[in-house]
UniProtKB/Swiss-Prot annotation:
One of its GO terms (cellular component) is cytoplasm. Belongs to the CLU family. mRNA-binding protein involved in proper cytoplasmic distribution of mitochondria. It is found in: Cytoplasm. HAMAP family: CLU. Pfam families: CLU, CLU_N, eIF3_p135, GSKIP_dom, TPR_10, TPR_12. One of its GO terms (biological process) is intracellular distribution of mitochondria. Disruption phenotype: Causes mitochondria to cluster within cells. This is Clustered mitochondria protein homolog. It comes from Dictyostelium discoideum.
Amino acid sequence: MSETIDNPTVEEYNEKETVVSGEQVEQVEQVEQENEQVSQSFQISIKTPAEIGTINIQVQPTDTLIDIQSFLYETSETCLYSSFEFRLYGKQIPEYSELSSIEGLVEGATLEMVPVDYNERSAKLHVKRLRDIMNTGLTEFANMNNPSLFTSFSFPEKSNILTEEQQLEEQKQKFEQQQQQQQQTEDKEEKETIATEQQQNKKNKHHNKKGNKKNNGDESLNNENNEEKLTPQQKERKQKMTEIKGIDKPMLSSYYPESPIAPVQCVKSMIYSGWSPVPGYRKLFGDLFYLDITLLEGTTICVTASTQGFFINQSSNATFNPSVSPKATINHSLHQLLTQVSRLFRRGLNQILTNIGRNHPFDMLPGVLPVHNWVASSKTNRYDINKGTDTFVSVQDVELRGNPRDWNEEIQAPKELPKSTVQERIIRDRAISKVNSEFVECAIRGAQVIVDKAILPINPAENQRSHMFLYNNIFFSYALDTRDSFTDCGGDDAARTSANNDLKGIRLYNLADIDGLYTLGTAIVDYKGQRIIAQSLIPGILTTEKTSKIYYGSMDTPTNEEEEQQQKEENEENKNNNTKSIKADPEFHSRLLQAASLLHLSESKVISEDTNQEVSVCTSFESKGIIGIDGRRYILDLIKATPRDPNYTETKDQLSVLRPEAIATYSEYFKVTWLNQKRQQKLKEKEERQKKEGIDPPTATARDEDVQLTEEDLAQSPVVSFNPNLFSKVKLGGTPEEQQKDIEDLKAIGAFLKGILIPRLIEDLMLFNVAPVDGQTLTQVMHVRGINMRYLGYIAKNESANVPFIQDLLFNEMVSRAAKHCFNRLLRSTNASDMAHSISHFLNCFLGTETGSVSADEKSKKAKQIKSSAINELTQGKLWSEIAQLVSSKFDFEIPTHSVPMESRLIVLRCICLKMGIQILAKDYNFTTDAPFSPEDIVDLFPIVKHVNPRSTDGLDLLEAGKTFFNQRKYELATELLGEALAIYHQVHGPIHPDAGACFTHLAMLAYQNEQYDLAIEYQKNALVITEKTAGLDHHETVQAYTTLAVFCQRSGRYNESIGYMKHVLYLTDLLGGEYNPERASIYTAIAAILEDTERFDLALEFLKQTLKHQEFLFTPDHLMCSTTYHKMAIVCARATNFDDSIIHQKKSTDILEKELGEAHPRTKESLEFYTGLSQTANQIKLFKQHQALKAEQDELARLQKEKADQFKKSQPRVSAMPPSLENGSVSELLNYINGKPKKSQSKKSKSTNTTTTTNTTTATTSKSKITMAKTPNPTTKATTSKSSATASSAATNKSTTKTNPTSSSAADSSKPNKKSSKN
């Protein structure tokens, strides 16, 4: 994480916006105006030798041909072409030229890729390029160094929900198609004969019908058509990705998904031939080297790489015949040659390129530095002879065999470039970023070979702890207390801390960016327990000439090994005088004062003990200023670039310094407080003046608005600055009053830290305004607020933070940090052959459970296999005693237990692996055993690197301004600023950078707010892949990116795609989120919403119940969050027509609102109206079901009576004459006639009534029930017209109830004749 000075937001201090926003707006407007002048993109064409032909690309004037070349390398169609040059109108263009400087390169111009001759280096790079691309078909991921799992969880769909603009556009297209068809029909009618016209009209009519049917059905049958187009493998993958069965226990063995792409092989082998190197006489023919390639068909060919290209020669293993074979002609590219002679190679290469093209465009791009994951899939080592020969033929370290790079000159030269305009700053920042990434990459390689003892030190005669190294012109040293400088504050551990503080100081001074003041290129690499410091060399620092002596600061206690030679000379001169000699060169002092004003450091006086005179300095006395033989002024040893922490003033805490974020926040707070006091003072003076004049005092609001501060008042606001030499070993100068004031000022910020910043953090944690889920996010949250990690114990002991989730989080982080120190000490004393045993044994002691299942004989047998005694001496009890002691000394906190809680062990395992660079196998570890880990589970050990991490200041300004306008809902302006920031980041850092990912994230949110869902999804996919590559596959920001993408897909109707992403989010959240992680509730709610949209109501209800369970634990059962969840559960039950449960859930939601907000609150009223509507709907449905049951009973009775009557007819064949009046009579009349009883006379009125009633409707109970139904008012009408809440869920419920209205009304209407007959 890069550490910069973060100012407080407007929300934190309401007065800030009126104080500083004007200056910020002016800066942003200036940057924007300059950026518009230089970033006017234009389109050019590239004529390629590939089958794709000419392609069009959008470029910036500041781009170079190298940038275009990199783009072509990353495009699947042109990635195999490596040796070419660009020509414009037949004229060659230098590859480092900026596009703006190329004459004739304007909008629409065409650059031509022209093949050029090879040399040995370019030909070997071409072969390596082809080999790397072929290897992607055999590896698990396309980019193994920076993998992205996005493609594995992505099943892209088309949006089913169209925005208003898309609907209008679709209607417009349909209208134009109809007009075009009509015009075509009229043209045909004019040319053809009448008979032909009639026949053609029929065809046109039939064709138009089909076309209209097809167009009308496109929207409804879209998903079905897409489903039919899927192959069986795609259908199976889709079902596997989108299937959610419930909340299952996640397994670490399922961390990596199965690759949907089968391995693809192009050739059996491709190695350098034994006929290499080329004989002298063949060099005269242009031969460079020879390759032996075994094709998949089984044949082996020998290929010559020449300056003109590649061709097959006639050599074999026994004979050398370099002449051209008749099998194939010479080709400029190797893949073209192999395509001619091998059909299987052509098929395999096309498949690989197709697979690459299907991946996300950013998938193949490397990051600035690789991010190693802590989990590795089980994979076997593939036999590849090229990997063995790469050590000898690789061109990656060619600089080691030639002149080494002058890193200091490369790092300092870009800082001297002009920076008056945005274009100049972009060029400058890009050069700084590029050389820093190359320096760090080389530093990592150097640190690894040093720890592995593969190179010799430059001082082999001295103690091993004092060894120094030079690798590729980079100076390396161990971060150890080799001269007993830190014996009072921790020894070697303090030396590690001082190296880290020095790097932070370099970052600050680079951020200040003072002309004429330089810092060294620096990187810190932690590898196998050792901390290695890598620095660029100051010219002359290691020579015996006195050309680089100290001009500023103290000369007696150097902490970097670089000054050892010079220090020895200084000590020779003052060997009998053990005093602190402090210098302050005026030129140095004037430049450091500029930096000090930006860093809130005051000019202070210290006593130089050799002269006993006061010296004015504006840095810590330990810092040193050196003038190299190149004439540049370098500032070194910035271990106290910020003042001491006044809350930790003991000698053992002398390296405890304040964070720059805390200083910036306090400075702003102090300024706002002073301005408020100034305003109150003016207000008081005005009231006194009005009182004397007899004017009535205005209201409080009018008074506040009436008092305005002038620019002169703002200019008089005090500037906070601190003495960096307080609580240090140096003797302070100045008067006692000045010293006391400096101490009081410093103690004020200490009180501010403990009294405001930390309580505000605890409050936000309790209210879940911030919800760190692991040590990474907790560290980030605390650092951004200016709180050091040494305050973890102070926060944990605070009664306000006594929440299980927060306590578990703090405990895990403190224990992990203490365990890291124990781990480093163990690794430093471990032999290289025992490294896997050491790591697994430590993890077993740290996270295993001591059950006694391992016998003493087994332990003795394992101990004999290990040479390092430190491993055998380590036990679980001894380790946890050491961890408890470290937690007590570092965090002033006594841990309650000597073990990690079982539910947190996987979380802590991930934490310790990330801190130490350990990579373990993805398998399910049983933490209830003594030894859950074995040496075979340790896959790799990676170096952990910290570096300067330069960032573009212009891009940061535009990004922050875009965020501000986004929060103010000024979306158009925010989109413009964020787009410009993204363009700058692409030019400076490339697309794979955290800041570029932040731009894509905010652009996605802007597109989503503007209902441009497809665009929002594309932006968010870019942000997601960048986050995976820069933060990690399971980082909290990665989980948030997946969640946001799933929400966007849900809103656009891509439900299957959304479920695929949310399924992965659910896995990571349950795997690494802790037992009651607050993020779980929101994740479960989001999944429930998607399941509700896909009408999987039972599963949605299950997730909502889990949400409610977590919320009741984190908050209380009567919390408003629980009320919201109950309401969502009511909606889901209502949509599933389970109205009884829906009413119960909504009643609970309403009760909570009445208790927390009161009956008069609008939310309570809406909830009550919704509850009333649900009750009315449930009653209506209940009555309707009763009526349906009654009707079914009547129909059944009528059917039985009819059957009896039919049977009776069959049994009376002699009855041949029946009066017509009985043919339609009732059953009773029919029985009377059969029995010979006389028929009763009836009036016409009663006859008509009897014929209209149902045959079997005779009981009074039935008539009564029908009368009751007829009198019942229609509750749905009331629910429809009532002013209930306008939520989408209640609307869905109303839809389900209105479907029953026609049936209910018809049932009521059918009861009307019975009502009339009953009256009669």
